[in-house]
Each structure stands twice: as C-alpha cells, then as structure tokens.
A protein has these predicted regions:
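Short, solvent-exposed mixed-charge patches
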Residues: 342-343
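N-terminal secretory/membrane targeting signals
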Residues: 1-26
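Alpha-helical transmembrane segments
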Residues: 47-72
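Non-transmembrane, membrane-proximal soluble domains of secreted or membrane proteins
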Residues: 25-49, 69-266, 273-280, 297-311, ...
Length: 343
C-alpha cells in the first residue's frame, strides 16, 4: 500500500465505523435482543452462547490466516515454494475440529428446544390463537372472551398459546416474548411463556401468507394482575344497551344490522357483536372500541381511521376480504359512532 493513501483509508474506515455504530441505535420494538419472558431468555442464552463460540472460532481461524499470509508472503528473489499434495494430519484435524464445534452447538440447542417445547405448568392461562388473512383472533376459554389482534396476558402467570389457522400457514412471532410458532390449518402448535415485564410488545406474522402479509401485525399487552382482571371484567361485560344509544349511534346499529344485497356485504354476515350477530369470518366487534388499533395494528383506533377503513378497506390493506360496499358519508358517520360505543 502506498503510504500517501493511509489517511484516506483511515478516514473511510472511521466514517464506516461511525455509521455502523449509529445503526446500532434504537428504538427497536421488535428486537429479540431484549427478551421479557422465560422463553425469550432461553433463546437469548442460546444466541449468546453460540455467538461467543463463533467469535472464538473466527479469531482463531483469522489469526492463523493472517499468520500464514505474513509468514509465507512472497519476497524478492525467493524461489517458488514446493508444491504440497496433501497432509493427512491437517486434513483429519480440519475435519474433526468442525465436528467438535458442532457438538458444542448441538448440546445447548437441543436443551433449548426442550425448554421451549410448549409445555406449561398446571394453572397456565390457555389462549386459542387463530391466524386469518390478515389478522389474529384470540379466544380465552377460561373467561369466554373472543377478541382480535391485541393479546392481553398477566405478568408472572404462565401462558400457553394454542395456535392454528383458518386458511393458509401463518407464524406468530413477538420477538421480545419468544420465538415464532407456525399456525397451520387443522393442526395445533403450542407456545408457552411467562412474561416478567409490563408493557406493549410488538409482533408480526413471520410466514409469507399472501398479499397483505407485511400488514399482519400484532401486539402483546402484558399487564399487572389487577389491570388484567379489569380488562377481563370489561371484555366479559355485555355491550352497551340499545336504550342508552344516541340517535346517531342507534342509526349506526341499524346500519350494522341491515341485510344488504348481496348478503355478503352485510356487517352481521362476518362480524359478531354479543346479543346482536354471530359472524365468524371477521374480527369480533363486541368491544372493538377498547382496542388501541384496527386493521391488525396498522391504524390507531379513532373515528377518522374507522371511517377510512369502512370507506375502502382494500385501499389500506390490499386483498382484504372486507369489501367496499359503497357506504354514504352519513352511513359511515353513524356506523363509526356506534362502533366507538362498543367498549
């Protein structure tokens, strides 16, 4: 290397290092490097074990490489080195060494597989998780709750997710909670964890499942026992009684109940509201206003976004099975008013 180029190389290296370090900044809401459950800690332990092992292998191999390059570099006037056609000892060594390294990788990996096999102690909270194109359905048999996209769990209590799919293969993944599990039609997989930190943890479908796969988000809300009990009480309460609705909200209820032509364009054909309809193709709306987001986490749950969604769902989520049925501005206003009362 010409010495006058050293400052340029140093400058490029320094800039590259700064950019690399900047890229390590946060926040990263879906980072697996900050676990908050026993499942997540098990994966983190395995990752760190293999990382340090791999780093050690890298240092040894690269050190030997640099030594050979320097020690046996070409020198002026030096004759060509003799050709070597094999060394049995070396060949045996570099065959056995990777096998030994893989043994050190395999043992903790297998241990982690058994630690995260989906089993949980008696008394765990069981939740049925059903993947749909492109949203998540959650059923709590213990409480009789059916909701969507926002998974509420209590801190410190073991939880078992029983995963399946209503259509294609999906994969439930909330990185800070733990590893992903596939949701497959006519099959049940299990994911067990005990969360130890209160907060909202983002997740995503991690198996390509169609046109709006990237828009199939989820949120895991870990709550203290008192907050979780309050959420359960709110979700098991009956929906707002009709006689307490305002005139605008009552018109929204009538729009929700209306049988349209074709019938598949009717709200009650796909959505359930306790005591009013029993649709199963779309998310249960009994307490839809209590959720923080709509459209599988794409939009904050407010009146403006509800109106956008009702006007043209496919403009927000391409491929959505919910049709744009040509609602008027007044109809949308009434429906939004009614849905916002469903807390």
């Amino acid at each position: 290397m010409h010495f006058h180029r050293v400052p340029l190389v140093a400058a490029i290296g320094s800039i590259s290092l700064v950019l690399f370090l900047v890229a390590c900044g946060g926040p990263f809401p879906q980072s697996a490097l900050h676990p908050t459950s026993d499942f997540g800690y098990a994966l983190d332990d395995l990752f760190r074990t293999i990382f340090w092992l791999a780093l050690g292998v890298f240092v040894v191999v690269e050190s030997l490489l640099v030594y050979v390059i320097v020690r046996y570099r070409a020198r002026p006037g030096q004759p060509p080195p003799p050709r070597v056609h094999g060394n049995t000892l070396l060949e045996a060594a570099w065959t056995l060494a990777p096998a030994v390294i893989l043994m050190f990788v395999a043992v903790p990996t297998i241990q982690t597989v058994f630690r995260t096999d989906g089993s949980a102690p008696e008394g765990a909270l069981e939740i049925d998780v059903i993947g749909h194109q492109w949203w998540w359905e959650y059923r709590y048999p213990e409480y009789g709750i059916v909701t969507a996209n926002e998974l509420h769990v209590p801190r410190g209590r073991p939880v078992v997710l029983k995963l399946t799919s209503a259509d294609v293969i999906h994969s439930f993944w909330a990185p800070r909670i733990g590893g992903k599990r596939d949701a497959i039609q006519r099959r049940q997989n299990r994911l067990a964890f005990t969360a130890d930190s209160v907060g909202v943890f983002m997740g995503q479908c991690a198996e390509f499942c169609g046109e709006s796969h990237a828009r199939m988000g989820l949120r895991v809300l870990v709550q203290d026992s008192s907050d979780f009990a309050a959420w359960v009480a709110a979700q098991t309460a009956p929906p707002v009684p009709e006689d307490s609705l305002t005139e605008l909200e009552r018109r929204g209820l009538e729009e929700f109940r209306e049988i349209r032509d074709p019938a598949s364009n009717s709200c009650i054909a796909c959505h359930a509201v306790q005591g009013i309809s029993a649709g199963v193709l779309g998310p249960n709306l009994t307490h839809v206003a209590s959720r923080g987001t709509i459209a599988a986490g794409m939009l904050p749950n407010d009146s403006a976004n509800l109106a956008r969604w009702l006007r043209d769902p496919k403009a927000i989520k391409p491929g959505s099975k919910m049709p744009a049925i040509g609602l008027s501005t007044d109809e949308i206003e009434a429906l939004v008013a009614y849905l916002r009362r469903l807390r």
